[in-house]
Amino acid sequence: MSASLDRLERKLGYTFKNQDQMLLALTHRSYAGRNNERLEFLGDAILNFVVGEALFERFPQAREGQLSRLRARLVKGETLARLARGFDLGDYLRLGSGELKSGGFRRESILADALEALIGAIYQDADMQTARERILAWLTDEFDGLTLVDTNKDPKTRLQEFLQSRACELPRYEVVDIQGEPHCRTFFVECEVVLLNKKSRGQGVSRRIAEQVAAAAALIALGVENGND
C-alpha cells in the first residue's frame, strides 16, 4: 500500500484488510473500469440506518418528523463533503482526466459520494459494528451540536434540507392563481419536487404562506412527515 493511502487510513481511523475495497471506494465513474457507485449505494443505506438509530436512542421524546429532519441534516451532502475535506479525501480520489481538469476532486457531490462509498467498503471489509463506530466517530461534533430546537424550522427550509441530503434539485414554486380583492387576496401556489410525480399545492393570504403550505404538503407526500409534527 502506498504511503498516501496509509495516511488516509490513519485519518479515517480504519485499516483495510482488502486494499482493493478501499481503492474501489475512491474510484469515480469517470475513471476507467469499475467504480464506487455500488459501494456508495450500500454506504448510503448504512449511514442512514446508523444515524437514524443513534438519533432514536439520543432523543427518546422526539417525534418522527423531528428525527427525520435531524437525520437529513446529518447525512446531507454538505455535511459529508465537509467531513471528506477534513480527511483530504479529494487528494486520494481516482478521477478521469476530464473530471480531474474540471476540479472534480473539490466537488461537493463527488466528495460526499466517495465518503459514502468508503462506509460501504468498511462494512464489506469488516462488519456493521465497525462501520457504525467509524460513522459515529466522524460525526461526533455534529451530534454534540444537535438539539430538538434545531427542528423548529419552517416547511420550506425543511424541504430544502431534505432534498439537499438526497443530492436532489431544489423545489420550484409557482403562483398559479390569485383570487379576491386587493385588500383580501388568496394566493394559490404549486410546488414541484423531482422525487414526486405530482405537484403539491398550497394556498394562503400571502405568497409566502402559500409556499409554506405547499412545502408542508410536499414533505407529507415524500413520507418525511406525517402532518402531525
From Swiss-Prot:
Signal peptide: none annotated. It is an enzyme of class 3 (hydrolase). Its EC number is 3.1.26.3. SUPFAM superfamilies: dsRNA-binding domain-like (SSF54768), RNase III domain-like (SSF69065). It catalyses: Endonucleolytic cleavage to 5'-phosphomonoester. Mg(2+) binds at E40, D113, E116. Homodimer. Digests double-stranded RNA. Involved in the processing of primary rRNA transcript to yield the immediate precursors to the large and small rRNAs (23S and 16S). Processes some mRNAs, and tRNAs when they are encoded in the rRNA operon. Processes pre-crRNA and tracrRNA of type II CRISPR loci if present in the organism. This is Ribonuclease 3. It comes from Pseudomonas entomophila (strain L48). The lineage of its organism: Bacteria, Pseudomonadati, Pseudomonadota, Gammaproteobacteria, Pseudomonadales. The gene is rnc.
